[in-house]
Amino acid sequence: MSRYITASEYAARRERLFAALPAGSLAIICSNPEVLRNGSDNTFSYRASSDILYLTGFTEANCMLVFDKTGLSGSASSNEHSAGKSQNRFIMFVQPHSPAEEIWHGKRAGVSGAESDFGADRAYKIGSAKMVLSRLAKKAKAIYFKSGVNAKLDAMVTSALADKSTGQRDPLAIVAEQRLVKTAAELAIMRRSGQVGSVAHRAAMSHCLAGRSEFALKGVLEFVFATNGGVASYDTIVAAGVNGLCLHYPAGLSTLNNGDMVLIDAGSEIAGYASDISRTFPVSGRFTVAQKELYEVVLASQLAAIAAIKPGVTWGQLEKICEDVLVNGLNSLGFPMGKGGLSMSDVMPHGLGHWLGLDVHDVGKYRQRSQVEAAKSGRAAGKKRGKDVDRPFLEGMVLTIEPGVYLSLTDKRIPEPYRGICIRIEDNIEVTANGAYVQTAAPKSVQEIEEFMDYARNVRAECGDDALGIHIKLED
């Protein structure tokens, strides 16, 4: 269980899911599978399903969560076991203790640990899932189960549900909406993750030197993550020069060259929660005139969008603000933006940002159903239908703001000095009652970047490269 989230908070999350389920229902959530890297037994490092982390903090593979609301009224607490009372029961299926397996892969919680440490009202060995689910399904009036997550566990569940395998609903859609607004404990973790990610970006910036490879900067970033108890929250992107034209370019062997920019998109994961930060800066430590002009347009669009964030604002409003600043700025540099010229998708082929949390591209709808007036729709009250509209931001939501420009080398509509330049600037924003709180803080303005890289260059010249260090550990 996470040291950052209390057992009572996990229990409250499960109670919210129970409250959203109708009486008589049964909800089943399966873990994601382990994935082979190569060979027959060499797997990628396992990362638990975000929904299971959210509901329990449980990090082991090959498990299943069951929310049993098949009691008569479904109104009792999940911790009530009094005879004759209707119960909501939280059940876990987990891998049993196995000395032969645990000597290789580490200690398991087992059935007893699932009950004592992870809040299960009842736990069973994963091999018992089919038998137990078959019994529970007979009483269920509604089944909530999303297949396609884990083929092995899917087969168990499908077999157990038998004639109730049709008409199932998705329990993860309910959890997704619950995950969208973060608790105080979650926000504290995400601020920490943002701090760690920011320190890593500063370290990479200070170690940027012509002749080094993209991989070298990736190593710096991920060392700082590990030093602070984290891992990379996604595959680290370090793109030198025109490699930035590929939005999710993986760090490679390309060499950093003076005159080029390097685009880094990298974040840390702390206790399951991600940061997601992008910075773009010149390898030499000094922007060219064209790089500076373009960079300041992108930065202005990001700052304008961030300044507008507050409860009640929508993604659509932010996108309009960002686009207006970008278009006006690019036009001022001689770009033919607009009809007959360049479109926004020509220069920025991605959205402005996304939700952030346990997943880098976190769950939760960006648009929601809005009711229309019954008089306009011609339908009686209580049977209103609506259309999808941008959902307004709420206090406690966390999102990224990441405008960018990616300019083709060959598109003659682009003024020649700017061709081949790729820039993305991304920060993590917490929506508060008073507006935006920026969780990330790596050098961002032209002046900040040049001064920081000057400092690193001076330290290197006076004391050698080792004096810069990357053993950067934040205080707890």
Residue ranges and their predicted role:
Residues 1-476:
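Active-site neighborhoods and metal-handling regions in enzymes and metal-associated proteins
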